[in-house]
Regions:
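C-terminal "post-core" interaction segments
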Residues: 1-189
């Protein structure tokens, strides 16, 4: 964080992972608010919230695309709906199911859906995805010619949009820091 004015979190092509891991990561960026709730078929609801343990309150932008799914959607939805980050990119995949592996007597396993998750505002994103605040798609040619070493550089068009969005947020914050006629002297100095 030393010297950073803001952050770009890249969740593009992140297929997800563990529910608990996404909650832990969200708690590093959120001081308050709901992160996610899960609802079982029986209607049992479990709400998970931030714990006041955010590592920073500096502005952030999150990059998402159609490859962002499951746990990465939990994280991006929590940051967006708690007004902690702007989402840039393309609509996410839309996997809003909580699954568990059940062991079978022959030693094999079976994946079973045990619940669905909802964003902080109660939105079921399964098969719908999460829409970005700022749409930014790669062209067919750019996707075909893209090299991994260009990720997060000026050759990455979605990253350039994320940087521009972050700069706009930082500029707006600086313009709000000093308001003539206000008692906001500390911010003005």
């Amino acid at each position: 964080e030393q010297g950073a004015q803001g952050y770009v979190l890249d969740l593009r092509s992140n297929p997800g992972g563990l529910l608990e891991a996404s909650i832990d990561i969200a708690r590093q960026w959120l001081n308050e608010g709901t992160i996610v709730s899960t609802r079982t078929r029986e209607g049992i609801r479990d709400v998970r919230r931030a714990t006041g343990s955010a590592i920073t309150d500096k502005p952030m932008v999150v990059l998402i695309d159609q490859g962002s799914a499951s746990a990465s959607e939990i994280l991006s939805g929590a940051l967006q709906e708690n007004k902690r980050a702007q989402l840039v990119g393309q609509k996410t995949f839309g996997k809003g199911l909580v699954q568990a592996v059940r062991g079978l007597s022959d030693g094999s396993g079976m994946t079973v859906t045990i619940a669905k998750y909802l964003t902080p505002n109660g939105t079921d994103i399964h098969k719908n995805g999460i829409k970005p605040d700022v749409e930014a798609a790669m062209s067919e040619k750019e996707m075909r010619d893209f090299k991994i070493e260009n990720l997060g550089t000026s050759k990455d068009s979605q990253y350039r949009v994320a940087e521009t969005t972050l700069i706009k947020v930082l500029t707006m914050q600086k313009n709000e820091a000093y308001r003539p006629g206000s008692a906001n002297l500390e911010a003005a100095l």
